[in-house]
Amino acid sequence: MTGVQTCALPISIFLHGGERIPTVLDLVRKGESFDLEDMARVGYNGVVCVEAGGPVPGLGCAGRGIIAALEELEKKGAYEKYQPDVVIYDVLGDVVCGGFSMPMRKGYADKVFIITSGESMSVYAAANIAMAVENFKSRGYASLGGFILNKRNVKNEEEKAAELAADFHSSVIAEIDRSDLVSEAEDMRKTVMEAFPDSTAAEQYRALADKIAELCGMGEEK
């Protein structure tokens, strides 16, 4: 899992027992040499976590964090050492900066799955990402795997998501219900899967993982 730290509680905290791990940009800014183990941590259920990080507020380009993280992962042999079954790049819905679209280029990612709610700004951002994927199609970059509806319980939410997907000749591959267990797990510095493994929310996440694996041609390997 490679994430962009733009909030106070990056995903690595929840996947690594509540411990904040150094971001790649923080390590780079120190100007000192560092090892793979300094930037990567193995968290819950064997998930390897890396936080790209962001610039000092008001300075620099946030997309640079993604580029730096990808460069350092390759340079330090992360993929060879950990040999992950799946690599997930969790990036912002902002494709104005080329850095944020980096994982879908140059062979880093095979499929792009776009998470949206039925809120207008979320749909707008999702459409922009889908357009970026379309623009990259002729270059052989990652293809659009589908949309994931992260429900906010707004009016006509399912219809809006379905219409968005249809506009890009795609589909909504999963609908995730809004759940208070997410914030409860966050307070515990855990993921829902770790804190509430038998919950409906956890079951929806498992079903989503199975669907993504199927769409990526991994279904027969489970």
Give the ranges of each region predicted by the language model.
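Short glycine/proline- and acidic residue-enriched helix-loop micro-motifs
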Residues: 51-57, 191-193
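Conserved catalytic-core segment of NTP-binding enzymes
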Residues: 75-86, 91-175, 184
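Flexible beta-alpha connector loops of hexameric P-loop NTPases
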Residues: 54-64, 120-121
